Amino acid sequence: MSEAAPTSWRSRAVRLVGNAVAVAGIVFVALTVRRHLAALPPLQLSPSLSVSIALGVVANVVAMVLGAWTWRTLLAAAGAPISWRSSFSIVGRANLAKYLPGNVFHIVGRAGLAASEEGLKLPLVLATMTIETLMIIAIAVALGAPAAVSQLDALRAMVPAGPWLLLGALGLAVALVVVVAVVLRRRRVVVGSVALAKVAAADVVTCVLLGSSVYALLATAFPTTTMPWSICVSGFSLAWVLGFVTPGAPGGVGVREAIFLLLAAHSTTVEHPTLAAAFSAAIAATVVVGRLQSVVADVIVFVVARAMAPAPPQGRVATIK
């Protein structure tokens, strides 16, 4: 019997760092929940509103499932297929780190887990994640364009650089597409148009689903709202992408809510002062509850993904010659 083979110190280091990031993410999530609960306006929970809130959480969970599916689709197209279980487990555990300051730790976490658990090369992981990110940004910008055009003055009032951020996001997306294409071609990795079409379709479903959940919440909290569903979905997509590209906004917290709040307020006309005040309160409650729905969904996905994670190596493994 030979000497026992020690567990890779790199694998242990990655797991320790991953656990530390996960714990830090949980702490920041708790702080986020506390801050949003404190900002929540008085809200009377009716059965219909409770159902809307629950369905919003489900919609956010489904969005996470679709996100894991799109990454797995890109990996398979690039010649590095992994199981659905692994894809969901890696994405779900790493996602919680997006609430850490810097807004990059979920990317680092996913790359580390993919390397340590699936043996995927870092350039391939980063390339597929870059394509995934560019696709969702492009789809969100396309869906958010109607809201941006119709509420351009309001957008400038809230975020003076907002239009430039959108143009910058598009320019960066185009530049990165070229860079990623060159890198993949040099490595003889080709992601076909079919895979890209699947990812684009999933991204459209994600944006429409999440935007619709916000609309359902607003319509339930304020039944007489005149905000069109299409503008709500478009406004959500616009707020999402601006929150994503705003530097230093962990998980887009604060930025997305503020932008959607402004767009919703300017896209709806309520003449009666009392109704106007009620509508403003309903919008405020909607954006706060919407963020809480997202946080709760992220925690649920993290718990499930953690349970699905492979067991860590048991230190030393005996081998027989």
Residue spans for each PLM region:
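Predominantly cytoplasmic-facing regulatory/coupling regions of multi-pass membrane proteins
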Residues: 1-92, 140-142, 146-248, 255, ...
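Juxtamembrane transmembrane-helix termini in multi-pass membrane transport proteins
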Residues: 72-75, 111, 126
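A generic structured-segment signal
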Residues: 83, 94-99, 108-109, 124, ...
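Membrane-interface alpha-helices at helix entry/exit sites of multi-pass transporters
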Residues: 85-89, 103-108, 115-133, 272-289
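Mid-bilayer segments of alpha-helical transmembrane spans in multi-pass integral membrane proteins
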Residues: 95-104, 133-145
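Re-entrant/interfacial helical elements at transmembrane boundaries that shape
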Residues: 104-117, 249-266
